[in-house]
Amino acid sequence: MGMTTAQKIFSAHLVDEPFAGTKVLSIDVVMCHEITTPIAIADLMARGKDRVFDPTKIKAVIDHVTPSKDSKTATQAKMLRDWARRHDIKDFFDIGANGVCHALFPEKGFIRPGNTVIMGDSHTCTHGAFGAFAAGVGTTDLEVGILKGVCAFREPKTIRVNLNGTLPKGVFAKDAILRVIGHLGVNGATDRVIEFGGPVVAQMTMESRMTLCNMAIEAGGTSGICMPDQVTVDYLWPFISGSFGSKEEALAAYSVWCSDADAAYEQVIDLDLSDLAPLCTFGYKPDQVKSVTEMAGTQVDQVYLGSCTNGRLEDLRVAAQILKGKKIASHVRAILSPATPQIYKDAVAEGLIQIFMDAGFCVTNPTCGACLGMSNGVLAEGEVCASTTNRNFMGRMGKGGMVHLLSPATAAASAIEGKIADPRNYL
């Protein structure tokens, strides 16, 4: 019997199996940010274990509230900063160099097919887009990862999701993953890996694949995975060219991590996206999804474009295409947070930032702040936000606020009209 990508990674990284079904894996990359890591740091220090297993395998960034908004967040940032310096962690990104972790770390080339990746952040599954097993973990597991370079997992079964057809005009990766979550439900992939495949995935950029995998957790998934292919190699080539004689050689090496043709899946789901319309959430769960035509006319107070889901350059490009030469509705606050400094620079060079500002957007530094209601876009009670983020839980972006999740294209159209709007009318 063949193996899935996840099974291959588990087998290659197995260190111990202390209990039936529980496997201790060696970890290739431990990611850290200033919200969850300081808790682990403080506990390790209290127990006299202020050590790291390998500083070259730890990547750290201040990204959630940046610059710090108050003494509490400044203290959290300082703890991470001091810890990184104390342990000579070279890949630490402070104010000015920092970006949203799940956009910044792929941009830096830190992930490879077949890697194991952990972080104290539920959207760590983003990095599965590279053919890695990437999962968010709790504080105790993060501590063990930092100290020993290992982490225990129950080996997850894999759900294969084939995205068939071709995405229609005005429909993007965000719409595709909302369709998947709407089909599975918020608990449909609990303790499972969602392996994305099919013609739609084959046609996607790495940025779009990251959007897919980013929201695997919203269906309960431990991780999302796309099998490595030529698109993966092309994206990674600037970082791996010294290790391979050619892209063909790299592809052959990374293809060993692809699921075998006779791999056994717990479930195989086929979704034809050829007739998919732009989608939008309507409630307080990511699986509460309707077409934009059903949601059209819903008034919004704020539009937010950014986050680890949709703050990348291709997201900004499609939104700017819609916004060029137009103004946002007079009653709407529109906020753009490019996910990394490089994305910001590229957007400036391409004239995108000018388009956003001319339309009436406020452009912030790279930050996660608005997504979790901590800074740079918090909602007041009763306010409604059309957002390209990944969670619409009650109070997620501010106590008493309502969040509608949608694509950058739909967000841009909604900013112009001041209500949920169909982007196909502008493309």
From Swiss-Prot:
Known cofactor(s): [4Fe-4S] cluster
Transmembrane regions listed in the UniProt entry: none
A GO biological process held by the record: L-leucine biosynthetic process
Uppermost EC category: lyase
Keywords carried by this UniProt record: 4Fe-4S, Amino-acid biosynthesis, Branched-chain amino acid biosynthesis, Iron, Iron-sulfur, Leucine biosynthesis, Lyase, Metal-binding
Transport recorded as keyword: no
Origin superkingdom: Bacteria
Family matches, as Pfam families: Aconitase
Pathway linked to the protein: Amino-acid biosynthesis; L-leucine biosynthesis; L-leucine from 3-methyl-2-oxobutanoate: step 2/4
Gene3D superfamilies, A to Z: Aconitase, domain 3 (3.30.499.10)
The UniProt record lists the keyword 4Fe-4S: yes
UniProt family annotation: Belongs to the aconitase/IPM isomerase family. LeuC type 2 subfamily.
Subunit structure: Heterodimer of LeuC and LeuD.
Family annotation (PANTHER family): 3-ISOPROPYLMALATE DEHYDRATASE LARGE SUBUNIT 2, HOMOACONITASE, MITOCHONDRIAL-RELATED
Name recorded for this polypeptide: 3-isopropylmalate dehydratase large subunit
Organism of derivation: Citrifermentans bemidjiense (strain ATCC BAA-1014 / DSM 16622 / JCM 12645 / Bem) (Geobacter bemidjiensis)
